[in-house]
Amino acid sequence: MQKYLEKANVLIEALPYIRKFNSKIILIKYGGSAMENEELKHCVMQDIALLKLVGLKPIIVHGGGKDISAMCEKLGVKSEFKNGLRVSDKATTEVASMVLNHINKNLVHSLQNLGVKAIGLCGKDGALLECVKKDENLAFVGTIQKVNSKILEELLEKDFLPIITPIGMDENFNTYNINADDAACSIAKALRAEKLAFLTDTAGLYEDFNDKNSLISKISLEQAKILAPKIEGGMHVKLKSCIDACENGVKKVHILDGRVKHSLLLEFFTDEGIGTLVG
């Protein structure tokens, strides 16, 4: 009997959060180990399906960095990084597009199997993500200038769950690889999302990354700005995206450990939460 009471308590604890976030847009940046481990992948898909089925409006922006690197190596295409961003010449961009579109279709299939009306989109579809070149040294890496959010709003209105590949184009129809964190942030801002959640391979933000006891469970926008210059690599890019989002209409940003099963549900629907809350 005790285990049934515990299950009931879990549902009761979740109820006020389900009510609070009903019909709210939740932007989820999906990447890291949660994409690579089949068991974790299934847990994430279950979480997102549940979010959708209890009345939230999730949107997924996915990465695929390790798969892109593996395919580049397999095809003999040189791949390098600068300041946490992949340098993308035409060959690398073509590989990235191919790999990301393959991942996208698999995610659509997974969610459809869970009863969700999922739809896959590339950022070039309907000029969803309009870009300019980010930096000459990064070649075809784009900075988003405009998100044509009307496309996403109409899909949400029709009960679809959009899954977005972070590939965009410029006014001359050149294809650009976009950092998935940047894409998620830009889309969340354009839609003024209730939440933006990053699934990562760390437990969250640390005051000192070498000290695992320095995990930050909650940080204000001003504190995040102070911490950002002290962080390097991919997490620096992620924290900059968090700050940008909070300054531009996104209410809360979450950095979650995608290696923990059901981390999305634990963060959104429990009192304690998990990971780092920014904002």
UniProtKB/Swiss-Prot annotation:
Protein name: Acetylglutamate kinase
Site (Transition state stabilizer): residue numbering on this chain: 29, 238
Alphabetized Pfam families for the sequence: AA_kinase
EC number(s) on file: 2.7.2.8
Organism: Campylobacter jejuni subsp. jejuni serotype O:6 (strain 81116 / NCTC 11828)
Pathway the protein acts in: Amino-acid biosynthesis; L-arginine biosynthesis; N(2)-acetyl-L-ornithine from L-glutamate: step 2/4
Catalysed reactions, semicolon-separated: N-acetyl-L-glutamate + ATP = N-acetyl-L-glutamyl 5-phosphate + ADP
Binding site for substrate: 64-65, 86, 177
